[in-house]
Structures are given as structure tokens and as C-alpha cells.
Amino acid sequence: MKEYEKESRILKALSDKTRLQILECVQNGISNPGEISRELSRHRATIEKHLRVLLAAEIVEKVPSLTRKGQLTIQYRTRKEAADLVRVIQEHIAGFE
């Protein structure tokens, strides 16, 4: 019998309102924890905790980049497969309204 570990991890990660808001930010180009925390008016530590869950579920991935001043920073982006999944889920949920 199939264990459904990956499916469970992904659905659990997507079942949190804050993580869905973070995904929306990332998909809209707000992609580092500091920017996301300001956008959502949440503590950076809270955002980073939720990003770790999204990373573990392979919904987002880290992308190193440089600031204009040449400092290394970490950006996040939604994996294409995850973005497609979220879109399909949202379309199906809209049918319940």
C-alpha cells in the first residue's frame, strides 16, 4: 500500500493560511524573508519558520543572489510544479463558492 508521505507533506504545507500568503508574495515577486515579513506584517522569524516548511515540502526553493551593493542574499521562488498545483487547487475550491 502506498504511504502517501510526499502528498501528505505537500498538503499539510498548503493547509496553513500564512504559508498560502507567503506563496502569493513569492509568486508576486516579493521573495526574501525581510520583504515578505513587511508585506504580511509578521515577524521575520515567523516567515522563516513557514518558509522552512515550504522548503521541506519542495514547494519553494532557495535562490542565492546579490544585492546592488554586492551582498549575498537568499531569495525564494515557487517551483513550477507547486505553482501549477496551487492554481489547480484554487480553481477547484472556487467551484465550491
Task: Locate each region found by the language model.
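Residues within the DNA-recognition helix of helix-turn-helix
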Residues: 50
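Alpha-helical residues within the helix-turn-helix
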Residues: 38, 55-56
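Long, low-complexity, charged/polar intrinsically disordered regions in eukaryotic proteins
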Residues: 1-3
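Conserved segment of winged-helix/HTH DNA-binding domains
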Residues: 69-97
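A short, conserved structural fragment
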Residues: 58-65
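N-terminal helix-turn-helix DNA-binding core of bacterial DNA-binding proteins
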Residues: 5-46, 65-68, 72-78
